[in-house]
Amino acid sequence: MLEITDLLIAFDPATGVRRPVCRAEIAQRLLAEGETRAATAVQRLPAVDGLLDDDYVDRLLVSVHCEIQRLSEEFRHGARMAALIDPILNAMRASGLRGPYRVVDIGCGTGYVVRWLSRNAASPDVEYVGVDYNEALVREAERLARAENLHCSFVAADAFGLRDPAHILVSTGVLHHFPAADLGRFFASHEADTTVGYVHIDFQPSKIAPLGAWLFHRTRMRLAISRFDGIQSARRAHQPELIGRAAATHAPSFENWILGQRVRHTPLPCVLTSVIGVRRSLADETTAAFGGRARALEPMT
């Protein structure tokens, strides 16, 4: 399953340089998936000599991410992330690891989570950094941070290749963009010496998730691309068990947990689930910092 926004922009994997995108090629890929309406929407996008207009695509992606922020606000992504990274930070402090601690948001988009954390969970020993390949999204994140007078930073780069690497890696709504076969490589990248912990929040697949996504995006999103991609996100989300196996196999230095598979005291699936990991040497301190919530942490094997 494909999302339109995943196809509108491409980068050279070796250099990170942006590459031209052929409009007809991505429309054909969508048609091959049976997504006629999505292909038609792509065919209407401005192009020069058959190649998508980069400036238009950048403006479109910023607009889409502005709409995505509505989802982030309603699902309290900022507060949700703060509640999950705070125990890891406290465990690092308790163990004697000295700050500043660098929290890096992978695929930050326009930086909602980083900006929320900077505004509501600021600490002298914590740095919040948002990273995204798309320079237009990074510029918009920087503009919004300046407007809010926030002390955080944003970088157009590979989150795993930063000059000042992360101590805690986080993301929201990113895991489902990776094919299942690439999840192992993603988690293997967490094995860098500097990485102490991670928190990745994403949609949880279920029979009712596509319907819920359709209702939400029909009522909250104006852009057709936002509506289409939102439903696709719910449809292509990975099962927590699959994510758990990838993390346990490819990030063996970490104690890995899943949180939030079921609504409390019911068999109903949560809309979002969280994958959490810390170095094994910090596992006891982290579970202690979670307090009573530690009972809800399910080990991943």
Regions found by a protein language model. Name each.
Residues V170:
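A conserved beta-strand element that flanks and buttresses the S-adenosyl-L-methionine
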Residues T194-Q204:
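Conserved beta-strand signature within the Rossmann-like core of class I S-adenosyl-L-methionine
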Residues F203-A251:
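C-terminal alpha-helical "lid/dimerization" subdomain adjacent to the S-adenosyl-L-methionine
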Residues D58-L84, I88-M92:
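Class I SAM-dependent methyltransferase Rossmann-like catalytic core
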Residues V104, T110-D158:
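Class I SAM-dependent methyltransferase SAM/SAH-binding core
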Residues M1-D54:
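N-terminal auxiliary segments of SAM/dcSAM-dependent transferases
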Residues T249-T301:
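Conserved Class I S-adenosyl-L-methionine
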Residues F178-H190:
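A short, conserved alpha-helix within the catalytic core of class I
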